[in-house]
Amino acid sequence: MGGKKKVHPKTRTAAFKASEPSEIVEAPHSFVIHRGLACPYITDLTLDFRRIMEPFTASNLREKRMNRIKDFVSLSSFFHVSHMGIFNKASTQLSFKVVRLPRGPSLTFKVHQFTLARDVISLSKKQMIDNDHFKHAPLVIMNNFSGDGKHLKLMATTFQNMFPSINLATVNIGTIRRCVLFSYNPDTKLVEMRHYSVQVVPVGLKRAVQKIVKGTVPNLGKCNEVVDFVTKDGYASESEAEDDEQSHVVLAQTLKSKGNLEDKKSSIKLHEIGPRLTMQLIKIEEGLLTGEVLYHDHVVKTEDEKETLRKLVEKKRKQKEQRKKEQAENRARNLKLKKDEKWAAKRAAEGRTDSDPEDDAEYYKEEVGEEPDEELFKMEAKSSRKRPSLGGGMKYKNKRAKLDTKDKNDKSERTDKYDRKDKFDRKDKKDKFDPKNRRAKFDPKNKRAKFDHRKSRKSK
């Protein structure tokens, strides 16, 4: 037999766990979902965008068709979610919405082009990607968002607030392994989004030495010694171009990678890991996907039209509040009516009436001016119990008396249930005709069944 199974303590929920650090709680968290028509490419694009937002996003979030936006909004406060990205696939176009939870504003973009991460990586010669790159938030780079329009400032602020801010005085340079670029083109009004991995390489070394430091050494079959490989640059890859001097920086900290020391020059290289997005800002709404339209790219309205729309929105809001109030009152009234009906049915089942004899007597006295007769309004004795109360000794039945063990074990008085006699030989009882017994024959003289020998012989 197996031993006793060990009982492990249950893992408790987040409410019972130790409190999270303030850096994680205050960091902007996000939900990225997709709605609309089913499309496998949109699902992959949603997963790739979640990859960009890591680690402060729900990477394994599973949304269903029955889920609504308000379901995610109701959970946002519990999980410290500040932003939500929504990819919506329609029959004619793909849109991307960025919502600031829980009260807005909401930015709606039209997606002109997109490329999945797997396609971008397959096109690159060097695939510089590692799971350790996604343990920290990326660096956000904004380009050309310094325009006159307020919508540009709001758009730039929204993109920056989607990622945690970086304190230059306390940041660890080794944790910056990725960067996200948002570039705005004022001529076409398009926003280009790119995602890169960051690689830091020491400067001032020959190509051969750099390869030895990195640990990627080519075929040395033609070399007699390592010195031949170092002194001759012909063995290095010709496809590698020289580093641009603009990418050279002096490191303020020593990195874990080989050759990157403090106060030494290093070169920063970017490798695109995808996805790519080309989108255009269409609309900015004040509320959570509703409310006043602050900016629209296609429709331009005058101040009078805006004021009319504000009044219309305010009117609809008041009507909605009034309907909610009326619904709450109707619900309370219906509950009260049901409760009264239930109580009246209970009183009717108990044989009671709503009228009280004392009240009837008072009413008679006020109307007639005389005392009513005693027999007119009789006070019936009210019983609070449906059944009469029983005494203490009558609540339970008396127990049966136990048989004496001597009488129980006496074999002489006991009858054997297997000791059977033929029912035709019994004289103590008058035999009757049994229609089920085919061997018996009825005799009308003595009114008793006789045994038929012919049938018994035939059966043999």
From Swiss-Prot:
Biased composition (Basic residues): 447-460
Keyword terms, alphabetized: Coiled coil, Developmental protein, Differentiation, Oogenesis, Phosphoprotein
Gene Ontology process terms (BP): female gamete generation; imaginal disc development; larval development; maturation of LSU-rRNA from tricistronic rRNA transcript (SSU-rRNA, 5.8S rRNA, LSU-rRNA); oogenesis
Phosphothreonine carried by residues: 353
Any single Pfam family the record assigns to this protein: Brix
Function text: Required for initiation of larval growth and normal mitotic growth but is not absolutely required for general biosynthesis or DNA replication. Required for progression of normal oogenesis and maturation of some imaginal tissues into adult structures.
Protein's recorded name: Protein Peter pan
Species for this entry: Drosophila melanogaster
Organism phylogeny: Eukaryota, Metazoa, Ecdysozoa, Arthropoda, Hexapoda
